[in-house]
């Protein structure tokens, strides 16, 4: 029997890097909502009293970027007396956006391998490798450690926003260690929560007293509600629970650490349980395969697991800049497949169109901000891009495709047995 502990982390929307992801995706939403053909590569930097947005944009949209950025920062919770050196109203907002390089644009506008099919005309916006993953740890087919870390981070933000724990400030991190036996989760070993807070907590000013109070409150208001519907729950006696191990966390957010777009790519995906191609998501329009192809790879992997063709599935895609069709497609089922990896790969090649233009069209990636009232990608920029039933993400809806795959596999087996 193999036994091991696997750990994943998440961060709240007030973490400096996550502020940047949300700002970059808010810029993307605003541009696509007016002009769905916008080309966007927006990077954000935050530090004490400063937010800079930079990158490349080609669009017919008219956006007040400074107003937009301030609204995102305010919504996260950095405003007024609790802003801590990074106030939505008073921070400097700098905008340095250029147009997309014509050398890149020509390859995206017309793929090198197009053959008259309109979907062939959209070439990949860059070379790269992307991974998608799914497993049957949870109902949303995500690894349990990252799923639970996100639950805790979201609940931590929720009790701050609703005033249940009024001393909490926006910055925070969670980390969960899960015990696996034979690759199945059997216990929650450790939960770690680091959360920014006011210098005094409900009349308590000494460091030990503050830490004890926060520990008690977080178990009651964060851990228990976040895990209430899980079959595998933490146990107050058996699960190690660590809160603010350094003692206090008063200085946080951009005042404590600079933030950058794209520095939480493992948090955004599978918590390290699957491989990652290295490309970030936020601030990138759908022609960037770092984003769109990673969504498609997750869709494929989730379809395979939902269809019962594997308990775990990892899909690798690779692309060349300016070329529509993937350079390679590979499926790995880690010995859990109902059929071989080669057969799974053949099923994927036969039943999924993984050209960028086809991915964009299938998931309506250019239209989603417009269809959802001007906001879509910003909501994916915190608490993960996958396994999010709260967001109704098109790449998570696999019911129909999984059924088609199952039928195709059954037909394939029937034909094989008749030979």
From Swiss-Prot:
Gene3D superfamilies: 3.30.300.10. K(+) binds at residue 43. It catalyses: L-methionine + ATP + H2O = S-adenosyl-L-methionine + phosphate + diphosphate. The keyword Iron does not apply. GO terms for biological process: one-carbon metabolic process; S-adenosylmethionine biosynthetic process. PANTHER family: S-ADENOSYLMETHIONINE SYNTHETASE (PTHR11964). One of its GO terms (molecular function) is ATP binding. Keywords: ATP-binding, Cytoplasm, Magnesium, Metal-binding, Nucleotide-binding, One-carbon metabolism, Potassium, Transferase. Mg(2+) binds at residue 17. L-methionine binds at residues 56, 100, 257, 288. The lineage of its organism: Bacteria, Bacillati, Cyanobacteriota, Cyanophyceae, Synechococcales. The gene is metK. It is found in: Cytoplasm. It comes from Prochlorococcus marinus (strain MIT 9303). InterPro entries: ADOMET_SYNTHASE_CS, S-AdoMet_synt_C, S-AdoMet_synt_central, S-AdoMet_synt_N, S-AdoMet_synthetase, S-AdoMet_synthetase_sfam. Its EC number is 2.5.1.6. Binds 2 divalent ions per subunit. This is S-adenosylmethionine synthase.
